[in-house]
C-alpha cells in the first residue's frame, strides 16, 4: 500500500479525533519496518494524550485492514520544529520560512537545497537560495523539512569561545 493510500485510510479516523494528518513516512527494513505518522492540531499543538489516542485508533485500523506487509513499528508524533512538508498546502502555509529540500533528480547537478520558501503553485515550489530563485517540481521532492531559527526561538546553544581565548578566572574558595 502506498503512503497516499495509507493516508486515505487513516485520515478519517484522525479527523474524527479533531486532529489533522500531516503525513506518513514508511521506512522499510529487512527486520522491522517503521511506519511514522505525523499528526497536528494547528490551534493548540499536539499533546502526548493526542498521540496516544491517535495511536490506538491507527493500530485498530491497521489490524483490521492489514495494509503493511511484514513486521513494523508504529510511531505517532507531532511534526516538531523541523516539520516535514508533504503537500503543496504545507509549503503555502509556511511561505517565508526556511526549508531544506532533497530531490529525486538533480537540478543543476544538486540534490539538496536550502532556502526561504518564496512561491508555491500546483506544480512547483520556488525557494530563494543564495539570493537566486530555485524552482522545484513537487513530483521531484524526495523529502522536505522546515529549518527552524533556533536562535530566534531562544533555543540556540551558547556560542563557543574563540580558539586561544583565555578562560574566565576561577575564584578560589577556602578559609583565609
Residue ranges and their predicted role:
Residues 1-176:
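Short Lys/Arg-rich amphipathic alpha-helical segments
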Amino acid at each position: 500500500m502506498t503512503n497516499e493510500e495509507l493516508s486515505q485510510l487513516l485520515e478519517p479516523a484522525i479527523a474524527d479525533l479533531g486532529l489533522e494528518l500531516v503525513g506518513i513516512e514508511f521506512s522499510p527494513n529487512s527486520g522491522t519496518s517503521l511506519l511514522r505518522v505525523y499528526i497536528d492540531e494547528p490551534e493548540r499543538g499536539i499533546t502526548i494524550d493526542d498521540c496516544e489516542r491517535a495511536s490506538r485508533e491507527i493500530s485498530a485500523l491497521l489490524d483490521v485492514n492489514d495494509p503493511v506487509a511484514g513486521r513494523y513499528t508504529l510511531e505517532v508524533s507531532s511534526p516538531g520544529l523541523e516539520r516535514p512538508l508533504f503537500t503543496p498546502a504545507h509549503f503555502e502555509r509556511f511561505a517565508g520560512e526556511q526549508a531544506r529540500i532533497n530531490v529525486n533528480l538533480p537540478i543543476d547537478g544538486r540534490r539538496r537545497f536550502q532556502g526561504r520558501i518564496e512561491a508555491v503553485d500546483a506544480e512547483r515550489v520556488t525557494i530563494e537560495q543564495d539570493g537566486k530563485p530555485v524552482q522545484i517540481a513537487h513530483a521531484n521532492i524526495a523529502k522536505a523539512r522546515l529549518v527552524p531559527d533556533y536562535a530566534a526561538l531562544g533555543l540556540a546553544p551558547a556560542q563557543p569561545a574563540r580558539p586561544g581565548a583565555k578562560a574566565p578566572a576561577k575564584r578560589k574558595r577556602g578559609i583565609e
